[in-house]
Amino acid sequence: MNLYEHTIVARQDTSPAQVKQLTEKYSKIVEKNEGEIVQTEDWGLLNLAYIIKKNKKGIYMHFKIKGPGKIIDELEKNEAIDKNLLRYMTVKVKKFNLEAKYFSKKDEYEKKEYKKEYNRD
């Protein structure tokens, strides 16, 4: 089994219901092709580095997928014709870091401890 990290960027005017539909749609494609979604992260609305199809922002969703390579072919074939998506990217990895949340904010407790430890207010 191969391990992949797959990120999709939806248009900024996509509703939360449509985002949920996109997530379910691509999850079903993975399961139909003998794969498994290990983890899903919703990174939310983020600024794009440059304007893509008249959008300055995009809604990012990230999947950690385990399965054969045909899953990625099928995903990318469907994503290429989806009008709600601006971009998609897949990276093959050797192992998953399930504890890392790429865009999560630090816990308030950690911030307070840091300030206390280094005498910063």
Swiss-Prot record:
Entry keywords, A to Z: Ribonucleoprotein, Ribosomal protein, RNA-binding, rRNA-binding
Cystine pairs: none
Coiled-coil regions listed: none
Example GO biological process: translation
Signal sequence bounds: none
Keyword RNA-binding: yes
Keyword Ribonucleoprotein: yes
Transmembrane domains' residue ranges: none
One annotated GO molecular function: structural constituent of ribosome
Gene Ontology CC annotations of this record: cytosolic small ribosomal subunit
Pfam families: Ribosomal_S6 (PF01250)
Family per record: Belongs to the bacterial ribosomal protein bS6 family.
Function, in words: Binds together with bS18 to 16S ribosomal RNA.
Official protein name in the record: Small ribosomal subunit protein bS6
Organism expressing this protein natively: Pelagibacter ubique (strain HTCC1062)
